[in-house]
Amino acid sequence: MTALKNDRFLRALLKQPVDVTPVWMMRQAGRYLPEYRASRASAGDFMSLCKNPQFACEVTLQPLDRYPLDAAILFSDILTIPDAMGLGLYFETGEGPRFKKTVSTLADIEALPIPDAQKDLGYVMDAVSTIRRELNGRVPLIGFAGSPWTLATYMVEGGSSKDFRKSKAMLYDNPQAMHLLLDKLAQSVTAYLNGQILAGAQAVQIFDSWGGSLSSAAYQEFSLAYMRKIVNGLIREHDGRKVPVIVFTKGGGLWLESIADIGADTLGLDWTCDIGEARQRVGSKVSLQGNMDPTVLYARPEAIRQEVARILASYGSGTGHVFNLGHGITPEVDPANAGAFINAIHELSAQYHQ
């Protein structure tokens, strides 16, 4: 594979020296960009974008053509795995993701197949290899998957949920069924991420979007334990380089020490944590990624710059920090403000890497 021209993202994840703090944004290829909206219109709908490697490559690269980002992230969706299990993913306008079928009983879960990463999700692997080829070493490519608990909530609820009542009822009423579902999902996610790594992903992130909805005891047993299982099963070196693993639980600020203990390289933080305190709590065990509140991007560029400066100062000197938002960038953000955010990080962080 082509040598990397900019590897500061991978270096920061592995706590190696960098010249400036690297940055990428969750959902950086998304609806806030007019070029993304044009591609989505050409593709017809969201799933056609995901399932066509050329379209997926095109939208993955769009933010990199516009901004000096330090990493690309595969354009896909966390729900590709339940879709490949036969649940029939579709998107309702204004409603978000839905499934034609849901799982509610032990029998439903026993009947679920574990998807073959190459055969059933080959379009994702094709997208990864296409993007790597097109990137030509500009920046590293991040692969990703949803966490077992997060995927399970969509499969049981049939879509997004405000209170996760069906998933939590299953967790407490029928823990055997929930554990079987989570175990199947952990096996599926492990194979899926390893497939992405073999296809060319140079780092991977596990998105535990809904782990923060659980009680502490339930989080440890039904979310964290399965992410640990995945991390233990991942390919950690490929193409002569380490493949760093990032784990991100939104709302996981109470459990940073436990999350830092599962063997991942990097801990993703949402905006409710102070990054300096997080650094003290986890010590040198993991690097940190985050964590500006994405809604700060609706403020003026000077205010964005101030908040970037505050977070950089809170983290302090040295490597081990990848700057990001505390969750995905939202559709109404002005692309110029995203640019101001990225430029501020590179301009203001050099002093911390002398």
Curated annotation (Swiss-Prot):
EC primary class: lyase
Pathway field: Porphyrin-containing compound metabolism; protoporphyrin-IX biosynthesis; coproporphyrinogen-III from 5-aminolevulinate: step 4/4
Alphabetical list of Gene3D superfamilies matching this protein: 3.20.20.210
Source organism superkingdom: Bacteria
Sites annotated Transition state stabilizer: D77
GO molecular function terms attached to this record: uroporphyrinogen decarboxylase activity
Cytoplasm keyword on record: yes
EC code(s) of this entry: 4.1.1.37
Gene Ontology cellular-component annotations: cytosol
Keyword Cytoplasm part of the UniProt annotation: yes
Pfam families: URO-D (PF01208)
Binding site for substrate: R27, Q28, A29, G30, R31, D77, Y154, S209, H327
GO terms under biological process: protoporphyrinogen IX biosynthetic process from glutamate
Main localization (coarse): cytoplasm
Keywords carried by this UniProt record: Cytoplasm, Decarboxylase, Lyase, Porphyrin biosynthesis
Subcellular compartments: Cytoplasm
InterPro entries the UniProt entry points to: UROD/MetE-like_sf, Uroporphyrinogen_deCO2ase_HemE, Uroporphyrinogen_deCOase
Catalysed conversion reaction: uroporphyrinogen III + 4 H(+) = coproporphyrinogen III + 4 CO2
Family annotation (HAMAP family): URO_D
Functional description taken from the UniProt entry: Catalyzes the decarboxylation of four acetate groups of uroporphyrinogen-III to yield coproporphyrinogen-III.
Entry's family note: Belongs to the uroporphyrinogen decarboxylase family.
Subunit structure: Homodimer.
Name of the protein in question: Uroporphyrinogen decarboxylase
Organism: Pseudomonas savastanoi pv. phaseolicola (strain 1448A / Race 6) (Pseudomonas syringae pv. phaseolicola (strain 1448A / Race 6))
Gene behind the chain: hemE
